C-alpha cells in the first residue's frame, strides 16, 4: 500500500506542472488569435442573435393563410385588412374550441376514451345552426372520405 501512496503524489506533481504549461499556452493562443477574433465576433453575435430570435419566435397556430385562400376562391378581387384577418382567426379558434368541447362531452357521456369523426359530426350539428350545420357536415364527410381514400 505504501507504493500506491507514493505513486499518487508523484502523479500530482506533473499534473500541477501541466496546468501551468496550459495556462501559458492559453495566454499565448488568444494573443495570436486577436485578428481572427475580430472576424469571428460578427458570426458569434449573429449566432447569439439567431438564438434570441429562436427563443422569441414561438410557433403560433393561425389560419390566416387558409382564410386568405378561401377569400380568393370566393371573391378574387377583394382583399382583407390585418384587423379583419385577426378577427376571422379568433372566430375560427373560438368555433374549433366549442366543437372540441362539445365532442369531448359527447365522448364522456358515451364513456368512450377517443373522439371519433362521429363525435365531431354530432358536435357540429349541436353547435352550428340549421343550414350551416348541414353544409359543414357534408363538407366534413367529403374531406374525411378524400383523406381515407388517399
Curated annotation (Swiss-Prot):
SUPFAM superfamilies reported in the protein's UniProt record: Histone-fold
Per the record, residues carrying N,N-dimethylalanine are 2
Composition-biased stretches, type Basic and acidic residues, lie in 1-35
Q: Where in the cell is it found?
A: Nucleus; Chromosome
Q: Where is this region: Disordered?
A: 1-57
- Residues that bear N-methylalanine: 2
Q: Quick one: a GO cellular component term?
A: plastid
What are the entry keywords? Acetylation, Chromosome, DNA-binding, Isopeptide bond, Methylation, Nucleosome core, Nucleus, Ubl conjugation
Q: List the InterPro entries hit by this protein, alphabetically.
A: Histone-fold, Histone_H2A/H2B/H3, Histone_H2B, HISTONE_H2B_site
Record carries keyword RNA-binding = no
Query: Which residues in this protein are found as N,N,N-trimethylalanine?
Result: 2
Which Gene3D superfamilies does the protein's record reference? Answer: Histone, subunit A (1.10.20.10)
Highest taxon in the source lineage: Eukaryota
Q: Where is this cross-link: Glycyl lysine isopeptide (Lys-Gly) (interchain with G-Cter in ubiquitin)?
A: 146
Q: Which residues carry this modification: N6,N6-dimethyllysine?
A: 13
Return one GO MF term. structural constituent of chromatin
Q: Which residues carry this modification: N6-methyllysine?
A: 4
* Record text on subunit structure and interactions: The nucleosome is a histone octamer containing two molecules each of H2A, H2B, H3 and H4 assembled in one H3-H4 heterotetramer and two H2A-H2B heterodimers. The octamer wraps approximately 147 bp of DNA.
* Family statement: Belongs to the histone H2B family.
Q: What is this protein called?
A: Histone H2B.11
Species name: Arabidopsis thaliana (Mouse-ear cress)
Amino acid at each position: 500500500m505504501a507504493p500506491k501512496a507514493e505513486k499518487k503524489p508523484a502523479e500530482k506533481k506533473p499534473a500541477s506542472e501541466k496546468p501551468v504549461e496550459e495556462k501559458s499556452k492559453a495566454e499565448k493562443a488568444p494573443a495570436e488569435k486577436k485578428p481572427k477574433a475580430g472576424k469571428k465576433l460578427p458570426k458569434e453575435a449573429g449566432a447569439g442573435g439567431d438564438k434570441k430570435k429562436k427563443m422569441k419566435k414561438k410557433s403560433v397556430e393561425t389560419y390566416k393563410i387558409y382564410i386568405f385562400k378561401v377569400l380568393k376562391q370566393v371573391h378574387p378581387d377583394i382583399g382583407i385588412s390585418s384587423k379583419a384577418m385577426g378577427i376571422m382567426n379568433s372566430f375560427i379558434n373560438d368555433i374549433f374550441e366549442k366543437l372540441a368541447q362539445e365532442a369531448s362531452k359527447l365522448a364522456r357521456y358515451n364513456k368512450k376514451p377517443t373522439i371519433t369523426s362521429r363525435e365531431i359530426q354530432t358536435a357540429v350539428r349541436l353547435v352550428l345552426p340549421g343550414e350551416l350545420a348541414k353544409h359543414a357536415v357534408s363538407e366534413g364527410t367529403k374531406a374525411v372520405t378524400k383523406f381515407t381514400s388517399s
